[in-house]
Amino acid sequence: MAKSLSGLWLRSLRSITKTQRAQTRLMKSLLPKPARSPLGRPAKAKSPARRVKAPAAAPKTVKPVARAAPLPGSWKLSYFSATSPARAASGKRMAYWLYLPSGASASAANLPQPLPLVVMLHGCQQTAPDFATATRMNQLAERKGFAVLYPQQSAASDAHRCWHWYQRSIQKGQGDVQVMADMITQVRQRHGLDASRTYAAGLSAGAALATILALRHPELIAALGVHSAPVFGAADSAISGYRVMQHGAAAVVGEVAGVAARAIASARPPQGGMPAIVIHGDRDAVVRRINARQLGQQLQIINAATITRAEATRQTFPARTSGRSPKRAYSSTTHYAGRKPQLVQCDISTLGHAWSGGDDSMRFSAREGPDASLMMWTFFSRHFLG
């Protein structure tokens, strides 16, 4: 079913390009040529067996990992395996990359103070190094002084490296979500990172999984940042996942949010809630903007007990086309808990399915701002557990 969703996603993009002549470079990049079999024949899209044998696009997404680390800090690949007997029985092993800014020792004893940790989850057809390069999050971490953890989906688990956010078991916090929770705990202990300042962020399928991680483990995650995310809890299969991406949720927006709100309230008293920033482009044809609106509604329910102002603050920012840092026009809606922003929704004009303000030499990244990485870190830095 995971490969089914990936195939539907790619076929949707092919259909879009047939009907829209004014294509952006991003949308063109989403159209890999048909994979060829070892005998040189194109893999047949209509045959499920052929798709299993020839997962077309995955090899094309791998970029040179050196691009992600032209920085003075530490950038290393590691592998996480569960250590407890109960977890180890699953046999799950997950690769991850970790960036530690310069001056941060691998030994907790040598750190002047514990560093915050941002967990970054890539989207489909990306690797962890791709995502690090595209978002420029490591550069920001070097400037601001925080660690960045990039779990990576394996091509064996999904040919397009998509996270399976639409599966009910995942939505309940099992599978990859539990593996990541254990990974975060291990990485924080090993490197002496701040357990009260751990944040989850992601793009597209990675944003969907970051949402689940935050809502299922509010004792670990202090705040959430999502870019181009599907609404939470509305899918139960690959087919319905694709439908949600295109049309949003039918009826369960409030129901699943209410359940999540009650779970969080019991897991992290007296705070409750889950601080979150939601970023979406108004021309996203992969995960339609209705998802951002519905996810925002869910997060309002989840944060209802902590939001103290009846009215949200709304701001608009004009486009900037000249200078070294061009920006698209965008608007933001902010709900406050006291003086802290508790929930921010940012709608970016003319942006497609791409990380705003990133490295546009990479797939699913747009150079023009606003800078989504900086916006997320600015929001995260206001929140901590305890």
Where are the language model's segments positioned?
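A domain-start/cap signature at the N-terminus of enzymes
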Residues: M1-L117, P129-T135, A201-A205, L209, ...
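Short substrate-entry loop that stabilizes the transition state in hydrolases
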Residues: A104-L115, M120-A159, A234
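Cap/lid segment of the alpha/beta-hydrolase catalytic domain
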Residues: Q152-G175
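Alpha/beta-hydrolase active-site loop
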Residues: S169-H191, I212
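Alpha/beta-hydrolase fold nucleophile elbow
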Residues: G192-S204
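Short glycine-enriched nucleophile-adjacent loop
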Residues: A207-E219
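A conserved short beta-strand
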Residues: L220-A234
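Short beta-strand/loop motif that positions the catalytic acidic residue
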Residues: V278-H280, D284
